[in-house]
Amino acid sequence: MRKSYKFIISVVQTKMKILWNLKLINNERLLQIDNCVIAANHISLFDPPFIGSVFPKEIHYLAKAELFKNKILGKIISFVNAIPIRRGTIDRNALNAVEEVLNKGDSILLFPEGTRKSNKVKAGIGKITSETGKNILPIYIQNSDHLWQCFFRKKKLMIVIGEIIDITEFQSIEDRKDKYRKIAEHTLKKIYELKNECENS
């Protein structure tokens, strides 16, 4: 991990703990994570840095291409391994970049629902994991959209680390679109099952 990257995530971690009452559940599972697709629900602009900061290794992200038009912001998010993706279309360049990241042994954070305003799963994560053979780490984040309540200790910023999803069982499905869809739906189901751990802690 680059020293500058490590400094950035340590600052984010400190802010999450002190300002927003962070509770990280199942953090011991992070030590076993290497080269996978990290899949999480998406409720806030802060989700990528919050989730990324809990990992002991650098990870990569997808960010909408419009953000890179701002030169300063573009440099910042590129520095923390963001990959631009064009929304509303099949962005082959972004998909190729994601596969390149995974094939060289790194991990990438994806949001199966695509955007914060969507509650429908996108099949993209199924395509990526099926074609690269990489497993999926589900993560559930709660209250990143209620930071003021977290600041005043009315809520906790919570991140739950799930168990690795082995996609091997899906690889025998012959219809590719059906396979991608089933992987994506199963992943989203596993993400939202982690919500129970927030409520029980």
What are the language-model segments listed below?
Residues 3-4, 93-201:
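Non-catalytic C-terminal accessory region of glycerolipid acyltransferases
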Residues 23, 87-95:
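Glycine-rich, highly charged phosphate/nucleotide-binding loops
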Residues 22-24, 82, 159:
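Generic structural signal for residues in well-ordered beta-strands
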Residues 14-33, 155:
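N-terminal signal-anchor transmembrane helix
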